[in-house]
């Protein structure tokens, strides 16, 4: 027999064997209706909540494929998957240990408050890791996936993840479709090490760096990383995630991040970041400090231009959403300067600081509070009078003599020092 004929015969025999195997598998598999019922029961056991599946379909040819349509959890804010398509490796079905070559998720909604319920369920929080170094899922693709934050802010993402063993991403990319300037986050693994190069494009700038994962006793994972934000327009960056920023301007700095947990969900929930930043120049949006002072707080709508803005931003994911804490804030607008601190959480801002009308002047304490979209500024009455006098005197004397007549709560504040300031009336008292 010729060599070519032998190869042809060999391929034919192999094809026949594979066909017989697939027929055997088909014999084991249920009807679509039975299949949907089995998947529903399995999902409810793993997730710990009731679920519904609109329809389910499986096919062995031309390749093993499973399609789910209209998956929903029975929750106040349901988790929804419009369509999930899973492509299986045919050879792995024979061992009853299926491996997914690719899973595609389209038109999904993941409310953060609903997903958190699954973290306490072992079946959802601890996916099967397979045998040894086996890979149970090679690639995950998602399109039009909406993540809904604790505060109800919906953000749509597209992305892909290629997995190595133990669910380690080999390559991952996350995008915000239709956003300009674009947002992309890319992770690339360094060989087999639990270390990844991170490249982020957002707000017209970049934040490149690296992240690493370490395993500790008891199965706890520790995530750490460093990023270098460069030229990121703050308002544009937050607008990319359907959020409003209190300031605008291009920011640069250094960021460190960390998280601890036993699963990806726990790592995300515990994520902490610290960024030392500078924005030069910057603009405070929706608050005109000059107007607030000159009108004794009756008017404050507008903006405040700053020659520079520096400080430290700490973020912490909590059960009630992300908390952002600004400390060591220093801003300069011409001869005037401001120091202070602020906390932003659940759409509310609470800030306090000291306004210096001229170099060396006594500071006028102020507070800013309320919704981020429309905060209110407040200055103690005596300081209002001082601020108005100083504002009139500055063009003439070139100094802040008038401001020194102010009486801040607890005594005058000299130089650049800070002290806590309580909310004050918005009208000046008569002496």
Feature locations, PLM:
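N-terminal type II signal-anchor transmembrane helix
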Residues: 1-47, 402-411
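N-terminal "mature head" segments of proteins
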Residues: 35-49, 63, 103, 135-142, ...
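A short, amphipathic edge element
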Residues: 47-54, 307
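Flexible beta-edge/linker motif
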Residues: 57-117, 128-145, 265-267
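Small-residue helix/turn framework positions
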Residues: 64-65, 69-72, 101-111, 166-391
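Flexible, surface-exposed loop regions and adjacent strand-edge segments
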Residues: 116-123, 290-296
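Short, surface-exposed polybasic-and-hydrophobic patches located at secondary-structure transitions
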Residues: 119-130, 153-171, 386-395
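Compositionally biased, proline/threonine/alanine/serine-rich low-complexity intrinsically disordered stretches
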Residues: 384-431
């Amino acid at each position: 027999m010729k060599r070519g004929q032998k190869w042809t015969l060999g391929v034919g025999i192999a094809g026949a064997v594979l066909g017989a195997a697939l027929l055997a598998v088909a014999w084991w598999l249920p009807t679509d209706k039975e299949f949907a019922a089995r998947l529903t029961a399995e999902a409810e056991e793993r997730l710990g909540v009731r679920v519904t599946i609109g329809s389910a379909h499986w096919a062995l040819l031309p390749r093993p494929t499973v399609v789910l349509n209209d998956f929903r959890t029975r929750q106040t804010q349901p988790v929804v998957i419009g369509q999930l398509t899973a492509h299986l490796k045919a050879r792995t079905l024979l061992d009853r240990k299926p491996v997914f070559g690719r899973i595609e998720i389209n038109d999904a909604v993941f409310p953060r408050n609903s997903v958190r319920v699954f973290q306490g369920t072992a079946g959802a929080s601890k996916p099967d890791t397979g045998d040894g170094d086996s890979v149970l899922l090679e690639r995950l693709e998602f399109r039009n996936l909406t993540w809904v934050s604790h505060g109800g802010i919906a953000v749509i993402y597209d992305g892909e993840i290629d997995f190595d063993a133990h669910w380690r991403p080999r390559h991952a990319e996350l995008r915000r479709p239709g956003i300009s300037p674009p947002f992309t986050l890319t992770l690339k693994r360094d060989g087999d090490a639990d270390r990844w190069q991170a490249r982020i494009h957002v707000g017209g700038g970049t934040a490149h760096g690296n992240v690493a994962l370490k395993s500790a006793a008891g199965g706890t994972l520790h995530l750490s990383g460093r990023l270098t934000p460069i030229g990121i327009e703050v308002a544009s960056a937050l607008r990319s995630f359907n959020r409003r920023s209190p300031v605008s301007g291009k920011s640069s700095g250094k960021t460190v991040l960390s998280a601890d947990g036993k699963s990806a969900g726990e790592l995300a929930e515990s994520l902490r970041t610290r960024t030392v930043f500078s924005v030069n120049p910057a603009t405070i949006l929706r608050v005109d400090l000059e107007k607030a002072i000159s009108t004794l707080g009756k008017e404050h709508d507008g903006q405040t231009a700053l020659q520079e803005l520096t400080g430290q931003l700490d973020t912490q994911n909590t059960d009630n959403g992300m908390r952002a804490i600004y400390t060591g804030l220093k801003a300069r607008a011409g001869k005037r300067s401001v120091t202070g601190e602020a906390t932003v959480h659940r759409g509310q801002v609470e800030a306090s600081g000291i306004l210096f009308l001229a170099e060396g002047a006594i500071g006028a304490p102020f507070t800013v509070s309320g919704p981020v979209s429309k905060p209110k500024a407040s200055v103690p009455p005596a300081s209002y009078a001082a601020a108005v006098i100083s504002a009139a005197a500055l063009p003439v004397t070139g100094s802040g003599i008038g401001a020194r007549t102010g009486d801040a709560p607890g005594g005058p504040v000299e130089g650049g020092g800070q002290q806590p300031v309580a909310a004050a009336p918005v009208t000046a008292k008569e002496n």
